[in-house]
Amino acid sequence: MLKFTIPLPPVTKKNHQQIIVNKKTGRPMVIPSKQYKQYEKECGWFVQGKGLKINEPVNVKCVYYMPTRRRVDLTNLMEATHDILVKYEVLEDDNSKIIRSVDGSRVLYDKENPRTEITIDKAE
């Protein structure tokens, strides 16, 4: 079991995107915003288990404590978290063969201490 906390206000990847034009092809491309890239970089300081590259079935439970009561898409938050776990090599990949479930994941409110609590357990 691996459990750790990222003491930063959670940021979604999809709600913070930029559209740019590829200089070579002239086609529009969607890239993460500077805000998301900064969040991803700062998360690296708090992610535990870097380099584990877990490749067996696991349950990834994420509890997001948001700074406001605004509605937020849990799926987008989890997608951003899974991408960060793959980037920092905690998980080998974020496909369904490795992340079997996200049971228990939810969004709560904590104005004073926004954070993300992540628990990774072996899947049964």
Describe these PLM feature segments.
Residues 1-124:
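Acidic, proline/glycine-enriched N-terminal capping motif
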